[in-house]
Amino acid sequence: MKAFTRLTGLVCPLDRANVDTDAIIPKQFLKSIQRSGFGPNLFDEWRYLDHGEPGMDNSIRPQNPDFVLNFPRYQGAQILLARENFGCGSSREHAPWALDDYGFRVVIAPSFADIFFNNCYKNGLLPIVLPAEVMDRLFAGCEASEGYRLTVDLAAQTVTTPQGDSFGFDITEHRKHCLLNGLDEIGLTLRHAGEIKAFEDNRRQTQPWLFR
């Protein structure tokens, strides 16, 4: 998993509430268990004018010129602004995979669906909860200024605007440690590989019948 420490990135505003996981990555793209390759189909039904299916050449599909991800000013965005209850709907880990594969490292919203929120941390995507009034200020700043960038400092737990306004956010120490060090659940387990092996070797000696 990629580590996250500090990022100054271009911001894209998705001014919609209750964006569900089927909107983030539609169900027809869930057949793959690879974590990569979902970026071109992020927000597929809003991003394109036709119906998308796996294997299509997205470079020749007609794009929706009114969808924010297709605006030239937001190309290369790494921080997504969203509204309340982002990531609601069915549980699918493909949703954070698609956001990450597109290039987003941070999603900032007033609230998230619980399962999506947890899945973000497991896949190196930082979900940040800020009050609705702060989100209104960030949306206004982003829409008023082309090339609007925010600085997200995980160690300091702050989001800072180009004007120098800084907003703190909460994160558990465990999740913070994992993101700062690029550790997912497998990575955390592998850090104790020696201890696990020693435990298993001891069990083979003391409880050999378990291994017959």
Curated annotation (Swiss-Prot):
It is an enzyme of class 4 (lyase). This is 3-isopropylmalate dehydratase small subunit. Heterodimer of LeuC and LeuD. It comes from the Bacteria. Keywords: Amino-acid biosynthesis, Branched-chain amino acid biosynthesis, Leucine biosynthesis, Lyase. NCBIfam families: leuD (TIGR00171), PRK01641.1 (NF002458). Its EC number is 4.2.1.33. Pathway: Amino-acid biosynthesis; L-leucine biosynthesis; L-leucine from 3-methyl-2-oxobutanoate: step 2/4. It catalyses: (2R,3S)-3-isopropylmalate = (2S)-2-isopropylmalate. InterPro entries: 3-IsopropMal_deHydase_ssu, Aconitase/3IPM_dehydase_swvl, AconitaseA/IPMdHydase_ssu_swvl, IPMI_Swivel, LeuD. GO terms for cellular component: 3-isopropylmalate dehydratase complex. One of its GO terms (molecular function) is 3-isopropylmalate dehydratase activity. Catalyzes the isomerization between 2-isopropylmalate and 3-isopropylmalate, via the formation of 2-isopropylmaleate. The gene is leuD. Belongs to the LeuD family. LeuD type 1 subfamily. HAMAP family: LeuD_type1. GO terms for biological process: L-leucine biosynthetic process. It comes from Laribacter hongkongensis (strain HLHK9). Pfam families: Aconitase_C. SUPFAM superfamilies: LeuD/IlvD-like (SSF52016). Gene3D superfamilies: Aconitase, domain 4.
